[in-house]
Amino acid sequence: MALQIKIVAPNKVVFDDQVDEVVLPSVSGQLGILTNHAPLITGLSNGVMRVRKQGTFIPIAVLTGVAEVDNNEVSVVAMAAELGSGIDVDRARAALARAEQTLATSQNKTELLQAQTALERANARLRAAGAL
């Protein structure tokens, strides 16, 4: 028996398939989901979700959201999500550099919060792409 997983972001369905395992970047740490997992709802932090299909893990960058597990179905709604294989590594590295520069030089609290979020997003994207 497999898990049915569907990952949606505001502009698209990112992933919709049957898989053997899901590892979520929950707000309380990494959370592994296998078949017949107890029902749950959890918040997701910026990070890399991994889904295992036929022995291979597929990395997916996830930027905050929520996941629900029930009856061997995993539903993820994220602010943004992107398959690791589709990430523009150069663009993510440039975003990381900009965020690091802002964090090092800015005194504005709003800019610092935005830069911290941008840093987390760039790190998640680079990890999902296998570049970190």
From Swiss-Prot:
* One biological process term in Gene Ontology: proton motive force-driven ATP synthesis
Q: Which UniProt keywords apply?
A: ATP synthesis, Cell inner membrane, Cell membrane, CF(1), Hydrogen ion transport, Ion transport, Membrane, Transport
Membrane topology term? Peripheral membrane protein
State its location(s): Cell inner membrane
Q: Which domain of life is it from?
A: Bacteria
GO molecular function, one example? proton-transporting ATP synthase activity, rotational mechanism
The UniProt entry lists the main location of this chain as: membrane
**Pfam families, per database record:** ATP-synt_DE, ATP-synt_DE_N
**A GO cellular-component term linked to this record:** proton-transporting ATP synthase complex
NCBIfam families from the entry?
Answer: ATP_synt_epsi
Role, per record: Produces ATP from ADP in the presence of a proton gradient across the membrane.
Q: Its family? A: Belongs to the ATPase epsilon chain family.
PANTHER family, per the entry = ATP SYNTHASE DELTA/EPSILON CHAIN, ATP SYNTHASE EPSILON CHAIN, CHLOROPLASTIC
Q: What is this protein called?
A: ATP synthase epsilon chain
Organism the protein comes from = Gloeobacter violaceus (strain ATCC 29082 / PCC 7421)
**Upper taxonomic lineage:** Bacteria, Bacillati, Cyanobacteriota, Cyanophyceae, Gloeobacterales
Which gene produces this protein? atpC
